[in-house]
Amino acid sequence: MLPPKHLSATKPKKSWAPNLYELDSDLTKEPDVIIGEGPTDSEFFHQRFRNLIYVEFVGPRKTLIKLRNLCLDWLQPETRTKEEIIELLVLEQYLTIIPEKLKPWVRAKKPENCEKLVTLLENYKEMYQPEDDNNSDVTSDDDMTRNRRESSPPHSVHSFSDRDWDRRGRSRDMEPRDRWSHTRNPRSRMPPRDLSLPVVAKTSFEMDREDDRDSRAYESRSQDAESYQNVVDLAEDRKPHNTIQDNMENYRKLLSLVQLAEDDGHSHMTQGHSSRSKRSAYPSTSRGLKTMPEAKKSTHRRGICEDESSHGVIMEKFIKDVSRSSKSGRARESSDRSQRFPRMSDDNWKDISLNKRESVIQQRVYEGNAFRGGFRFNSTLVSRKRVLERKRRYHFDTDGKGSIHDQKGCPRKKPFECGSEMRKAMSVSSLSSLSSPSFTESQPIDFGAMPYVCDECGRSFSVISEFVEHQIMHTRENLYEYGESFIHSVAVSEVQKSQVGGKRFECKDCGETFNKSAALAEHRKIHARGYLVECKNQECEEAFMPSPTFSELQKIYGKDKFYECRVCKETFLHSSALIEHQKIHFGDDKDNEREHERERERERGETFRPSPALNEFQKMYGKEKMYECKVCGETFLHSSSLKEHQKIHTRGNPFENKGKVCEETFIPGQSLKRRQKTYNKEKLCDFTDGRDAFMQSSELSEHQKIHSRKNLFEGRGYEKSVIHSGPFTESQKSHTITRPLESDEDEKAFTISSNPYENQKIPTKENVYEAKSYERSVIHSLASVEAQKSHSVAGPSKPKVMAESTIQSFDAINHQRVRAGGNTSEGREYSRSVIHSLVASKPPRSHNGNELVESNEKGESSIYISDLNDKRQKIPARENPCEGGSKNRNYEDSVIQSVFRAKPQKSVPGEGSGEFKKDGEFSVPSSNVREYQKARAKKKYIEHRSNETSVIHSLPFGEQTFRPRGMLYECQECGECFAHSSDLTEHQKIHDREKPSGSRNYEWSVIRSLAPTDPQTSYAQEQYAKEQARNKCKDFRQFFATSEDLNTNQKIYDQEKSHGEESQGENTDGEETHSEETHGQETIEDPVIQGSDMEDPQKDDPDDKIYECEDCGLGFVDLTDLTDHQKVHSRKCLVDSREYTHSVIHTHSISEYQRDYTGEQLYECPKCGESFIHSSFLFEHQRIHEQDQLYSMKGCDDGFIALLPMKPRRNRAAERNPALAGSAIRCLLCGQGFIHSSALNEHMRLHREDDLLEQSQMAEEAIIPGLALTEFQRSQTEERLFECAVCGESFVNPAELADHVTVHKNEPYEYGSSYTHTSFLTEPLKGAIPFYECKDCGKSFIHSTVLTKHKELHLEEEEEDEAAAAAAAAAQEVEANVHVPQVVLRIQGLNVEAAEPEVEAAEPEVEAAEPEVEAAEPNGEAEGPDGEAAEPIGEAGQPNGEAEQPNGDADEPDGAGIEDPEERAEEPEGKAEEPEGDADEPDGVGIEDPEEGEDQEIQVEEPYYDCHECTETFTSSTAFSEHLKTHASMIIFEPANAFGECSGYIERASTSTGGANQADEKYFKCDVCGQLFNDRLSLARHQNTHTG
């Protein structure tokens, strides 16, 4: 019968027991979450009810309660109110699930209801089990095992256990394993595993003890029946107001006492199900039980297979958990029992007290000793001592740690071992995680019977719980056979981590097991590699990851993203594991591969290195060092290391590495990486000139370009080693500078096509070398990242006798019509005209850089088509030598740069194509070719010849659409196509970086990596220069020819106005413009044909212009280089002597000159023959020769830089005034050249400090000019973050910047990167800084360095004057000795006091120039007073005589008084005679006086008045005061102790009393214009006009 209804009123205080029906209601609310079987919960609970497994140690009563609860869920008594039906169904089911050994006996008893059946079973248990610790285990094991098999999770916490239990089928306990017929649960992903317990064997085992329990069975039966009847009676006493609800509540309350505890213990083990994990609570904690250690909890609460049918195991695990807490569990159980039937009378309780006490004792025993005990034996049969002994012997660590002692120090039993190694491990892990020691200890040692035998491996077990765990292990093994995996919740993962040696994951191939899925995954790699080895095609990319493992990974870690190896398709959870794995594919045979590759390269006569993308890929996957220094052969893993290394060679001699191979390295782009990924597949593509095979036409075109470069250098013994990369067109162009070869057979046109598949006629070797002695014409098409289709635009180029010019395009769809316009200059001729297709700042949407080059005569055309795909690179003008020169120099290069338009227009053929031949060929002049080649062999220096300029016209092209093969994603900015959207995304970032600055050079070279900043010209080209350069056209002979729209034409029109006398004719129509230069304009050196951007006409880069020097006609791409070059002409001493008959045009960007540096030294010094990679180097070098002549006396020949700075600096001064943008700044003291004024300032600080040192030490110190530059260069290698606003120099930290800023405080000008020593002509002073005046001649200077230079001239003059004066003094010495003494005595007696002021007025200047002379003079002056009275007077008169000399004799130069003290120090008598010859007797007397002073020198001990300024001594205060006034007048124009001033000899004392008398012969000359002035003030005013 059902329990009484009123019991629910006694249970509300059990807060720890949740409402089970409510929990089950949750299950009904979300049935799919838990069972996945649809909305029919009734059927679900029916299956749970039928499949509940009986677990012996749970006890029959608890099993009954569970069955009743499941039946309620199944039959739903709220709709079916027949309690009898429920009771009968429960009884029927109960009889079905009881152990087989008990069925005959129970059926013989014929129980009428469930209560009687329970009584029978309880009596049976008591008869055959001891009362001590092990009392309830054996029977409970059998019963509970079956209960588990037949239960399924109906309610909240126990939902999982019950549901899982019922999966194994209802009849597993009654039928043999092979006859189980229950259907597989829809949620189950594994086959219906047979985990039933061979209870028949156990029946015999328990029947041996049945007699011992008979005595208690009947009594217990009667008491239980009576107690249950009382419960029923109490239930009937309740009001029938809501019978169904009350019944359900009663069942829930009853179940909550026991069933909840069972379910709580393991419901959290199925954490994969959210509803169960939410409802589950740790019962031992919630009910006040002693909490067991977390490690032990995890071991038995985890590792349950999702589809495991042995649900009874879950109940076993919780019972073990509960039984751990001994005393609290007992107390709780007793209180639960008392609360379970609270309304029973005391008599009833006493009546059933024996039974209840026994069950409580049994409950306490298995609760307290479940982990340490086995079977429950009656104390009459087995002593406690024996039980404890069994505990010690059979207990083992549930954590799987292998410890040999439990918490109380008892020795522990090792886990059972299964047949195979895998099963051993699985058994250990299973037993440790899912079983408790009670199962392993449950068999007494003295029992020989092993009733439970495993059908899989034949192992026998005496304890059913161990047998259950063992079968679960087999279940897990079978999971792998069907490709299923466990639900690896966090708890399961922790179990696996905590188990040592417990291996659960088995390899299908070899059967090896692992305790972690990651270990299994790593193990599978071995098989995967073996599979790959067996594959014939090593490139096979077939996935080899077995699906079970892959799904296992997903289920274990719950991730959707894995790292997959592209070679073998193996997946990894971490990128680091993938990297390690990929080393296997690429690391083993790397040496052999490299050696084999080099052998192949040597066979075909060139070193062909893969592109940097492949290098990066190889580096990523363990390749050896891929960056090799071609100077010393050292290899590096990173390009940055190579760059740093190559600086060592560069610092030693930046010009000794000429001819070295290019080692330019790049950071590969994504598209290139994708292309390089297929590079190794070696998809063949024929090439006419080489023996190489290429995967794509782009590779072929790349290789063809390399062949062109190779052939260009064959005649000179160069063999090019190129790290070629599609996107990096800058590098390619840098190595395609066509050099004429000295051998005749090599001097042929060489034409390259970018795609062999197109209709463009690719010249064969015969065609290429058919031409005669002329320099080859290289049409270099920079390959795109992906294969581009190209074809001839203007028709096939037929090789002619003169030259061959092949036009090629990247367009694969539209033939473009190209037209050429010619600019011819009759006075000159360019044998070389290079068209550079310059990418616009905003990449054009059309990528058809087809340009035609045509030379009228003596010219050769070369077309450089920029990389149409790499729009981010601004391709600057390369030094492309052009033959021809002006009358005073050889200028070979006509750089024609074409900027693509953003919206190109179709070019209309017909107009302005006078030079274009009918057959699409170009006429290439043949004269002077041999001479040009000779000159080119000498690196760009050509003899004077008539100039005939070949004008190339960049035409607008039709709208292009790129659809290369395999390209699907097109860039809207530039039209480049990509096979992958990710590549397009990466590519579009390039345009984003371009927009702020117009264009950016992303170029990496051996010297440095250029940061993505505004591309500078050689040193400092800036925005202002870009805007104002067009206004300077007249000065710099700049010419433009554009092919753009009206805006561009208007710009050309403005230029035409500014160049009227130079007659730059421009024919502009809507779509094309032809620039025609009139013949006869010999000054027109460099026609710069500039295709500007239609959308952004304001972004004309000065890099597209060529500036011409008016003095020599030399052309420069860089305005700063022209400014720097013009300073050479400003040196008068070099104008006539220097043979500047050679000219160079150098690239305008750092990246260009870097490429030059990496192997192509094109600039040669005509004096010494030294070659340079950059024209700026040549300029600097030429200054050495100039300085050799100018500063030969000082031997200063340091004048060129060894390295360029790491980063180009912003030239703010050039932005303000481009005319002042000097490429180098010179130190006027030592001639040292600098790139930035900050370096010059730092260098000048050394000079200033040295000047102070000279003043203090009285000696000149040698200055090493290169120290500052070396330090500057070293500092440039560091990353600069803080920039100086004055000069643009950057510093690593703000402290250095603060120190640097102080340098500019004392500077008269705003020193910028382009400041030169002549900048004061146009730039105003920063502030009112005093002029520096020369004491010798009175000239004023703005800067102390100029004054220092000026004083050096005085020193030379003084030396000459001293030599002449010494000769004159020797002749007059005799006469001076006769006349001077008498005159001196007379003068001393009369003019002592009057002469002192004037004497002292002259002496300060003397002493300022020569302090050492005056150091001796005071002694002579002061000696007189202590000796004879007349002598001091005479001595005082002597200076007076000197001072009066200018007054008395106006013809006497003022410098006479200056030189006299020095001569007196050397030869007093001689010096005395020198002035006497030109002066009167008083003057001579004054000169003679020092000699007499020296005679009385020993009589003076100390002076009366000592001047601290000049250390002069005076005998009277009046003379001393007058002397001080002189010092005050001397510092009007000269700041005291000014840096950079040097003491020198004063020949003319401008402030002396004789200054006015000397005015006629005294002048002041302006250093700028040479104008003379009578006084310094006029000179200062005049100089202000120069400075503004």
Swiss-Prot record:
Region (3 X 7 AA repeat of P-E-V-E-A-A-E): 1397-1417
Tissue: Brain, glial cells, astrocytes, embryo, placenta, testis, ovary and uterus. In the placenta it is found in the layer of villous cytotrophoblast cells while in the ovary it is found in the cells of the ovarian stroma including the thecal layers around the follicles. Expression is highly repressed in glioma cell lines.
GO biological process: apoptotic process; negative regulation of transcription by RNA polymerase II; positive regulation of transcription by RNA polymerase II; regulation of gene expression; regulation of transcription by RNA polymerase II
SUPFAM superfamilies: beta-beta-alpha zinc fingers, Retrovirus capsid dimerization domain-like
Span of zinc fingers (C2H2-type): 452-474, 505-527, 563-585, 627-649, 969-991, 1107-1129, 1163-1185, 1225-1247, 1282-1304, 1332-1354, 1505-1527, 1564-1586
Region (4 X 5 AA repeat of P-X-G-E-A): 1418-1443
Keywords, sorted A to Z: Apoptosis, Cytoplasm, Metal-binding, Nucleus, Repeat, Zinc, Zinc-finger
Pfam families, per database record: SCAN, zf-C2H2
Predominant location: nucleus
GO cellular component labels: autophagosome; nucleus
Source domain of life: Eukaryota
UniProt repeat feature Sequence, residue ranges: 1397-1403, 1404-1410, 1411-1417, 1418-1422, 1425-1429, 1432-1436, 1439-1443
Entry note about domains: The SCAN domain enables PEG3 homo- or heterodimerization to control gene expression in a combinatorial fashion.
Purpose: Induces apoptosis in cooperation with SIAH1A. Acts as a mediator between p53/TP53 and BAX in a neuronal death pathway that is activated by DNA damage. Acts synergistically with TRAF2 and inhibits TNF induced apoptosis through activation of NF-kappa-B. Possesses a tumor suppressing activity in glioma cells.
UniProt name for this protein: Paternally-expressed gene 3 protein
Provenance organism: Homo sapiens
Taxonomy of the source species: Eukaryota, Metazoa, Chordata, Craniata, Vertebrata
Name of the encoding gene: PEG3
